[in-house]
């Protein structure tokens, strides 16, 4: 079972590397790590498990956050209609994105960042993702609103990008016109 001790923190070189694609068939270790990542997210959202094991709540995690510089991630997040998006995705790529942008009212956080970073992180409001499941089956998934923000945050990790790289350095509270704000 993964715990917070397994997650590398900002400053670790794996967080700034561009991760390499996995090849199929996946190794048993890659499959297990993907499943463990999803289990971590589920446990972190369970109040009893989170308290017992000292887990910070998370909705997404990428392999580089575990010092594994390979292109896979897990998300476990509900949208505003309580629809669950629970996936382990291998070699995910953003196929297309909306012109309309969105951000979270309270900014973003990260399991690898142990501090609050104020500022808006503006992202696409909708994205279409191409990816593979653990069996190598191709997937085409659409995300909008909060789940779209989460998946973009995690794909950024695969490209060595941290959420705060997107924050306006001169004015963190600057919000471009016509950006939808959630939360």
From Swiss-Prot:
<feature type="binding site">
    <location>
        <position position="157"/>
    </location>
    <ligand>
        <name>Fe cation</name>
    </ligand>
</feature>
<dbReference type="GO" id="GO:0006412">
    <property type="term" value="P:translation"/>
</dbReference>
<comment type="function">
    <text>Removes the formyl group from the N-terminal Met of newly synthesized proteins. Requires at least a dipeptide for an efficient rate of reaction. N-terminal L-methionine is a prerequisite for activity but the enzyme has broad specificity at other positions.</text>
</comment>
<dbReference type="Pfam" id="PF01327">
    <property type="entry name" value="Pep_deformylase"/>
</dbReference>
<keyword id="KW-0479">Metal-binding</keyword>
<feature type="active site">
    <location>
        <position position="154"/>
    </location>
</feature>
<dbReference type="GO" id="GO:0043686">
    <property type="term" value="P:co-translational protein modification"/>
</dbReference>
<feature type="binding site">
    <location>
        <position position="153"/>
    </location>
    <ligand>
        <name>Fe cation</name>
    </ligand>
</feature>
<protein>
    <recommendedName>
        <fullName>Peptide deformylase</fullName>
        <ecNumber>3.5.1.88</ecNumber>
    </recommendedName>
</protein>
<keyword id="KW-0378">Hydrolase</keyword>
<dbReference type="InterPro" id="IPR023635">
    <property type="entry name" value="Peptide_deformylase"/>
</dbReference>
<keyword id="KW-0648">Protein biosynthesis</keyword>
<dbReference type="InterPro" id="IPR036821">
    <property type="entry name" value="Peptide_deformylase_sf"/>
</dbReference>
<dbReference type="GO" id="GO:0042586">
    <property type="term" value="F:peptide deformylase activity"/>
</dbReference>
<keyword id="KW-0408">Iron</keyword>
<comment type="similarity">
    <text>Belongs to the polypeptide deformylase family.</text>
</comment>
<feature type="binding site">
    <location>
        <position position="110"/>
    </location>
    <ligand>
        <name>Fe cation</name>
    </ligand>
</feature>
<dbReference type="GO" id="GO:0046872">
    <property type="term" value="F:metal ion binding"/>
</dbReference>
């Amino acid at each position: 079972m993964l715990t917070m001790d397994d997650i590398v923190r900002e400053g670790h070189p794996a967080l700034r590397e561009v991760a390499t694609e996995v090849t199929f068939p996946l190794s048993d270790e890659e499959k297990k790590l993907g499943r463990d990542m999803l289990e971590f997210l589920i446990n972190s959202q369970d109040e009893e498990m989170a308290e017992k094991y000292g887990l910070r709540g998370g909705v997404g995690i990428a392999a580089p956050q575990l010092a594994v510089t390979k292109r896979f991630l897990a998300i476990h997040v509900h949208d505003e209609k309580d629809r669950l998006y629970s996936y382990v995705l291998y070699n995910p790529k953003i196929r297309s994105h909306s012109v309309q942008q969105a951000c979270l009212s309270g900014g973003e956080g990260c399991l690898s960042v142990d501090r609050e970073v104020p500022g808006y992180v503006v992202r696409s409001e909708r994205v279409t993702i191409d990816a593979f499941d653990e069996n190598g089956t191709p997937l085409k998934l659409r995300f909008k609103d909060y789940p779209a923000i989460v998946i973009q945050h995690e794909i950024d990790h695969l490209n060595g990008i941290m959420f705060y790289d997107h924050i306006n350095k001169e004015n963190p509270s600057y919000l471009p016109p016509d950006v939808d704000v959630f939360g």
